[in-house]
Amino acid sequence: MGLKKFKPVTPGRRFMLIPDYSEITKTEPEKSLLVPLKKKAGRNHHGHVTVRHQGGGHKRMYRIIDFKRNKFGIPARVASIEYDPNRTARIALLVYADGEKRYILAPKGLKVGDTIMNGPDAEITVGNALPLANIPVGTIVHNIEFIPGKGGQIARSAGTYAQLMAKEGRYALLRMPSGELRKVLVTCMATIGMVGNEDHSNEVHGKAGRKRWLGIRPTVRGMTMNPVDHPMGGGEGRSKGHIPQSPWGIPAKGYKTRKSKKPSDKLIVKRRKQK
């Protein structure tokens, strides 16, 4: 996995840094694990925009990913490492000994031909999934469950991981990708290693068109809008007149938006590191 730099033959190529896709071993996805994906353009069932800056982009099919890793005791062979347009990580196609095929997130270092196991008796090797109770302290993990059996929810993006810091009674202490220290039940599953494609954060699209191919539309600054459109709009020339805030009037800098008295507060030992 590396990044490709180009000769500046056009303005769009000058600063472009994109993956070389050297880890991809198969270009066609497994048809049995595909489902149609309808475009929403950031709209809800009323047709109102609920997520800004979305729309257009290349047509996609959704790849069904196994986040639960609940097929215990049956070895699986890594058949291919593939590109997934719906996420930043690469995905790996597993073929289990009984013939079943499943996609998982491809961790760093996983290669075609490797054997993977799920369950409490699996070895501590990259790609294997175990309950936190069976993972040694200090291990780097990803695709971590919050609720046993629900499937991994934490550390699923390219290059992310959490670290198992301690185990005490029913809970394991994890250092999250954000730096937050949080308790998670030891019966929750996690996968050994960090998510692959770790150079994703260094990518440079180079031109607006590449963002449009991804379905990302332009972001307009509030200060350039009219007062009807944004709290920071209006005025003569470039005039703020307000503290930086969202289109709905919520302060944008330093204001805590987490709901107070959340039940999960008791599981957070230390808040994430501040910017």
Curated annotation (Swiss-Prot):
<dbReference type="GO" id="GO:0003735">
    <property type="term" value="F:structural constituent of ribosome"/>
</dbReference>
<dbReference type="GO" id="GO:0015934">
    <property type="term" value="C:large ribosomal subunit"/>
</dbReference>
<dbReference type="InterPro" id="IPR005880">
    <property type="entry name" value="Ribosomal_uL2_bac/org-type"/>
</dbReference>
<dbReference type="InterPro" id="IPR002171">
    <property type="entry name" value="Ribosomal_uL2"/>
</dbReference>
<protein>
    <recommendedName>
        <fullName>Large ribosomal subunit protein uL2</fullName>
    </recommendedName>
</protein>
<dbReference type="InterPro" id="IPR008991">
    <property type="entry name" value="Translation_prot_SH3-like_sf"/>
</dbReference>
<feature type="region of interest" description="Disordered">
    <location>
        <begin position="221"/>
        <end position="275"/>
    </location>
</feature>
<dbReference type="Pfam" id="PF00181">
    <property type="entry name" value="Ribosomal_L2"/>
</dbReference>
<dbReference type="GO" id="GO:0019843">
    <property type="term" value="F:rRNA binding"/>
</dbReference>
<dbReference type="InterPro" id="IPR014722">
    <property type="entry name" value="Rib_uL2_dom2"/>
</dbReference>
<keyword id="KW-0699">rRNA-binding</keyword>
<dbReference type="GO" id="GO:0002181">
    <property type="term" value="P:cytoplasmic translation"/>
</dbReference>
<keyword id="KW-0689">Ribosomal protein</keyword>
<dbReference type="GO" id="GO:0016740">
    <property type="term" value="F:transferase activity"/>
</dbReference>
<comment type="function">
    <text>One of the primary rRNA binding proteins. Required for association of the 30S and 50S subunits to form the 70S ribosome, for tRNA binding and peptide bond formation. It has been suggested to have peptidyltransferase activity; this is somewhat controversial. Makes several contacts with the 16S rRNA in the 70S ribosome.</text>
</comment>
<comment type="similarity">
    <text>Belongs to the universal ribosomal protein uL2 family.</text>
</comment>
<keyword id="KW-0687">Ribonucleoprotein</keyword>
<dbReference type="InterPro" id="IPR012340">
    <property type="entry name" value="NA-bd_OB-fold"/>
</dbReference>
<dbReference type="Pfam" id="PF03947">
    <property type="entry name" value="Ribosomal_L2_C"/>
</dbReference>
<keyword id="KW-0694">RNA-binding</keyword>
<dbReference type="InterPro" id="IPR014726">
    <property type="entry name" value="Ribosomal_uL2_dom3"/>
</dbReference>
<comment type="subunit">
    <text>Part of the 50S ribosomal subunit. Forms a bridge to the 30S subunit in the 70S ribosome.</text>
</comment>
<dbReference type="InterPro" id="IPR022669">
    <property type="entry name" value="Ribosomal_uL2_C"/>
</dbReference>
<dbReference type="InterPro" id="IPR022666">
    <property type="entry name" value="Ribosomal_uL2_RNA-bd_dom"/>
</dbReference>
